[in-house]
């Protein structure tokens, strides 16, 4: 007797949950910027809205690839109905918002911020910041001559509230000796404006190394390695991202620092390149 054939049936395909309906795109937002009506994308920041219209709002701590931290306060603008000036780099636009980017109140605030920076920080290798000082008529010299520079390690050893009160005769500064503890990078914190770009680039926004962070409080706040150890003993992988985002030259390649000191640095011979490699700052090519 011929056996009956055996039939194999493929199992039914697994059931899939119904696809979620697509969310409709948010409607554009109508705002008024410096007296001119504008329509911008929902969720855009005031800074993005201004730049799409060709308005120049200055920034120091902002970078498109980093999370806004609102620390420099140079990008503040005036918003109708708001008691305080708001940071344009992080404040999203709202329907009906009226924004002033260059009012007298805004200019006075930016001038004050720039005066405090220029009177306490060495901006000699930050031409962009120097241009802003001139643009807003800041007069850092009115705060008095610079106070004495801190001795090596003095600022690192300070504790909150334990430093001497200024006498008002001189402008307190962050001047201090350059840190040179390796053959690749130098750290000149006398030029640091605490924009936090290096901390973010070393952290979750780029490298995820977390070799540097902010230490101290108030005027004694500073960028430091963990435990204030020398850079070679820290978690630093020498990727160069911190140097790439530093706006003032506080973090610099040692070769550039040495060439500047010897008067051999030629800015016109420098060039930039676009890359997707997180280690491009190492200089493999």
Residue locations for each model-derived region?
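Fe-S ferredoxin-like electron-transfer domains
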Residues: 2-17, 73-74, 82-238, 243-244, ...
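ABC-family P-loop ATPase nucleotide-binding domain
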Residues: 16-25
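Short coil/turn motifs at beta-sheet boundaries
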Residues: 24, 68-70, 281
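Short structural boundary motif marking the start of a folded domain
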Residues: 25-31
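N-terminal cofactor/phosphate-binding cores enriched in small/glycine residues
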Residues: 29, 36-95
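Short glycine-centered, acidic/aromatic-flanked micro-motifs in structured strand/loop junctions
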Residues: 33-35, 225
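Short, intrinsically disordered, charge-balanced linker/junction segments flanking boundaries
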Residues: 277-285
